[in-house]
Regions:
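Solvent-exposed, flexible loop/coil residues
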Residues: 20, 71, 106-109, 140, ...
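N-terminal helical cap/lid subdomain that shapes the substrate entry/recognition surface
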Residues: 2-106
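Asp-based, Mg2+/Mn2+-dependent phosphohydrolase catalytic module
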Residues: 1-7, 113, 127-225
């Protein structure tokens, strides 16, 4: 195995359980604004809609504002909400709940603690800055992360190669063999690594083009230590 120096870790569904975070925040939002208790099926419907919009954003087919408006408009339609839908208010309340909801995987703290003894850890994430910073403040593994790179602040989303420019500006190390991208998304994280000629570790199951693969984040020290 190469002598990596920098681990570029995805945030959501890699270190943090975003599926559960999303479920809680969405439920609180629709209960507050519409007095509605969402079913698991309805939450799954939103998950699919939201994921679709994020994939379109990665492909530069929509803007961030179109994503925010479209996902809530489409979801409200699926729920049969027929009155005028104020997507701006729904998104604002939803993201406020997201920023306060911290659900990390049980192994994340110990994984980051152990790996930080050998590697420099960075987080690379597509997301809204105040939401990601808010959740990071409550993360137990925060002391072991050197810096968080957020698409909102950089101005581009993974898998765009330009995202890596921000990382290089921070490290000053142009040797791409020193980096490893770790994440759960084939279209965002793994493709990003391929786009910038950096090795990748896919967190998940199934066939994939990554350099390495682990079932979940708890297995990362076994691979790298």
């Amino acid at each position: 195995m190469k002598q990596y120096q920098y681990l570029l870790l995805d945030f959501d569904n890699t270190l943090m359980d975003f599926t559960e975070t999303e479920r809680r925040a969405l439920g609180l939002t629709f209960r507050e604004l519409f007095g509605r208790i969402l079913t698991e099926g309805e939450v799954s419907c939103y998950n699919a809609i939201n994921r679709g919009y994020w994939e379109m954003l990665e492909r530069k087919e929509v803007t961030k504002e179109q994503l925010k408006e479209g996902r809530m408009r489409d979801f409200a339609k699926e729920l049969g909400i027929t009155e005028d839908v104020d997507t701006e208010t729904i998104n604002r309340v939803y993201m406020e709940y997201l920023a306060r909801t911290v659900v990390e995987y049980p192994a994340s703290f110990e994984v980051c603690k152990r790996l930080s003894n050998r590697y420099v850890l960075y987080i690379i994430t597509n997301g809204t800055a105040f939401v990601q910073h808010g959740r990071m403040k409550g993360a137990s593994f925060r002391p072991y992360i050197r810096k968080m790179f957020i698409s909102d602040e950089i101005g581009v989303n993974k898998p765009a190669p330009e995202f890596f420019d921000a990382v290089l500006s921070e490290t000053g190390d142009e040797d791409r063999s020193h980096y490893l991208v770790i994440g759960d998304s084939l279209t965002s994280d793994i493709r990003f690594g391929k786009n910038v000629n950096v090795d990748t570790c896919y967190v998940g199951t199934g066939d994939n083009p990554a350099t390495y693969q682990i079932a979940d984040i708890s297995k990362l020290p076994d691979l790298l230590l």
